[in-house]
Amino acid sequence: MGLWDIDKIPYVGREKGPQEGLAFHYYDADKVVAGKKMKDWLRFGVAWWHTFDQQLVDPFGTGTAQRPWYGKYSDPEDEALAKVDYAFEFFQKLGVEYFCFHDRDIAPEGDTLRETDKNLDKVVDKIEENMKSTGIKLLWNTSSLFTNPRFVSGASTSPFADIYAYAGGQLKHSLEIAKRLGAENYVFWGGREGYENLWNTQMKREQEHMAKFFHMCHDYAKEIGLDAQFLIEPKAKEPTMFQYDFDAATAINFLRTYDLMDVFKLNLEGNHANLAGHTYQHEIRTAREAGVLGSLDANQGDKLIGWDMDEFPTDLYETSTVMWEVLAEGQIGPHGGLNFDAKPRRTSFTAEDLFRSHIAGMDSFAAGLLVAAKMHEDKVIENLQAERYSSFDSGIGATVENGTASLASLEEYALDIPQSKLIEATKSDHLESVKATINNYMIDALAEA
């Protein structure tokens, strides 16, 4: 059995009933869908922090998690090293080829940055050994510039220069680790890069400091030969009242303002989209059309609760819309994947639940891929959209698109059109039928799986 009292998770399809929770019903890693293997479309990654560090605490109670390494180690460094073995066996039994981590997820902090880096390097040594022996790769790493109390007012936006300097030193070593481990991406999530109250905040100054920080990071990455794609992860709020990377559109505006569009793409999360008042599909479409889709965090929120819940994704409608966008793009960014930034519920506390929850998420996205592939094969959305905007393919509409129209030419065209003709020019969306069509594709595609 190994360190986990569970066998490698098999693909069973319809061989077992729908209640079998320790097998894949839709995720068949090597199955070719829309010209690529499932595993290559989805590129699943496991999040170290939720999977191996999360104790399932909530604001009203202590942790309920039961993990096989609990109670075995009195020294945090020994436990950190042991968790590397548990992690890589978990990845292999789940059949996942990527993982992600924050620097402070994998090793305990010391009193100084020098001590902390030393602790970190010991664990990185062991991670590197396991990566070489298993072939498992680092989708992305990042630096935790929000958990320690020193970051109470931010890191790159902190009003305290000593904290800014510490953040820079911490980030420098994190980039060196990315280089060493061959990270395909590097993520910046500004958990406390925002404000609690505008009265004591110089917002422009803080954002300028953050932009300078990002440019320093890019300069150092070039210096050491790190070619990982830099990613910003937008989030509207939590833990701050307002974060500067509120949503995809806000982050894109920041990148354009500070000459960073050629450096960064976006890492988008479903639950974060909800916190900004958007759907996951909206955020992905916004990034795609700006050319900055980088990677995805796979989770969902509860639509009735305005919190960052980090639930495992089980909403097939949402996974289908996400994968429709991914297939339209051709990939999840240049080097992106689907990282499960998700944790089991507090009542799902056994070690086995870590497998069950990841299986649920992986199957949900595999099912979404099958639905999206069928929709793209039939060009149902492409044809619908082409018909809706067809008036811009010729006549006055074509002059708008080719740039020859002017207000004068539009006026001349419209002056004598009666209202009856204008109303006649509009067409019904048949929106309810469109929504029903999506449902029908979900049912039909999964029935054929």
Curated annotation (Swiss-Prot):
Name of this protein? Xylose isomerase
Gene Ontology BP annotations: D-xylose metabolic process
Reactions catalysed, semicolon-separated, are: alpha-D-xylose = alpha-D-xylulofuranose
Q: How is the cofactor bound?
A: Binds 2 magnesium ions per subunit.
Kindly give the NCBIfam families that the UniProt entry links to this protein. PRK05474.1, xylose_isom_A
Coiled coil: is it a keyword of this entry?
A: no
Task: Tell where it localizes.
Answer: Cytoplasm
Q: Name one GO cellular component term.
A: cytoplasm
Q: Which positions bind Mg(2+) 2?
A: 269, 272, 308, 310
Reported EC number(s) for this entry are 5.3.1.5
Q: Which family does it belong to?
A: Belongs to the xylose isomerase family.
This protein's record includes keyword Metal-binding: yes
Task: Name the InterPro entries for this protein.
Answer: Xyl_isomerase-like_sf, Xyl_isomerase-like_TIM-brl, Xylose_isom_bac, Xylose_isomerase
Q: Where does Mg(2+) 1 bind?
A: 233, 269, 297, 341
Main localization of the protein described in the UniProt heading: cytoplasm
Give the keywords, sorted: Carbohydrate metabolism, Cytoplasm, Isomerase, Magnesium, Metal-binding, Xylose metabolism
- Catalytic residues, per the record, are 102, 105
**First-tier enzyme category under EC:** isomerase
Q: Which GO terms describe its molecular function?
A: magnesium ion binding; xylose isomerase activity
Q: Which cofactor does it need?
A: Mg(2+)
Quaternary structure note: Homotetramer.
